[in-house]
Amino acid sequence: MARIAGVDIPNDKRVVVSLTYVYGIGLPTSKKILAAAGVSEDIRVKDLTSDQEDAIRREVDAIKVEGDLRREVNLNIKRLMEIGSYRGIRHRRGLPVRGQNTKNNARTRKGKAVAIAGKKK
C-alpha cells in the first residue's frame, strides 16, 4: 500500500479512485492532481513508479488535506458559534444548518426522538 498524506491508499484500485481515500480529495481534485503530476488516471497504485509516487505526494502536499483541513473546518464552525450568527446558533443547538425543515424530519441532526411524558390519555 502506498502512503500519501498519512493515509494508506489501496494497491489494487486505480490511482484516481485510491486518492479519494484521503480526506479532502474527491474525484475532481484527484483528476487535477494526476494531471499536474503527469500520471495516467488508468494506472493502478501497485504499478506506480517511485518517481510518480513522489510527484503525486508533492501535488497533494500543496493542498490542504486530512488533519489541517479538519482543523480548519472545526475552527470555522467554532468561529460561527462565537460570533452568534444564525448558522452558529444552529450548530450549537444541534439542528440543521442549511435551512432544512425540522417540523417532521431532521432526525440525523436532532438525534433519536424523545417521547413526551403524559401525552397518552
Swiss-Prot record:
The keyword tRNA-binding applies. InterPro entries: Rbsml_uS13_C, Ribosomal_uS13, Ribosomal_uS13-like_H2TH, Ribosomal_uS13_bac-type, Ribosomal_uS13_CS. Keywords: Ribonucleoprotein, Ribosomal protein, RNA-binding, rRNA-binding, tRNA-binding. It comes from the Bacteria. GO terms for cellular component: cytosol; small ribosomal subunit. GO terms for molecular function: rRNA binding; structural constituent of ribosome; tRNA binding. This is Small ribosomal subunit protein uS13.
